[in-house]
């Protein structure tokens, strides 16, 4: 027998909706571990650092002072 015989399930992290794409209220934009992307306008953070839309609109990514922000613009 071997000591290496195990693996964890993938957590399906990453960007779910990309820039300039439409999103509905409550739609998930990014699943992440920690705040790699920070919430901008009309975006909120879930308890597992998931970013989701507070309003309907188009997703916009921007970098300000070396920080990545995600916003939802009408």
UniProtKB/Swiss-Prot annotation:
Taxonomy, superkingdom: Eukaryota
SUPFAM superfamilies per record: Ribosomal L27 protein-like
Q: Where in the cell is it found?
A: Plastid, Chloroplast
Per its UniProt record, what Pfam families does this chain match?
Ribosomal_L27
What biological-process terms (Gene Ontology) are attached?
Answer: translation
Going by the UniProt record, its keywords in alphabetical order are: Chloroplast, Plastid, Ribonucleoprotein, Ribosomal protein
Intrachain disulfide bonds: none
Task: Name where it mostly resides.
Answer: plastid
| Statement: the UniProt record of this protein carries the keyword Transcription regulation | no
Question: Which GO molecular-function terms appear in the entry?
Answer: structural constituent of ribosome
Single GO cellular component annotation?
ribosome
PANTHER family tied to this protein = LARGE RIBOSOMAL SUBUNIT PROTEIN BL27M, RIBOSOMAL PROTEIN L27
NCBIfam families per UniProt: L27 (TIGR00062)
Q: Which family does it belong to?
A: Belongs to the bacterial ribosomal protein bL27 family.
- In Swiss-Prot or TrEMBL terms, this protein is called Large ribosomal subunit protein bL27c
Supply the source organism for this entry.
Answer: Pleurochrysis haptonemofera
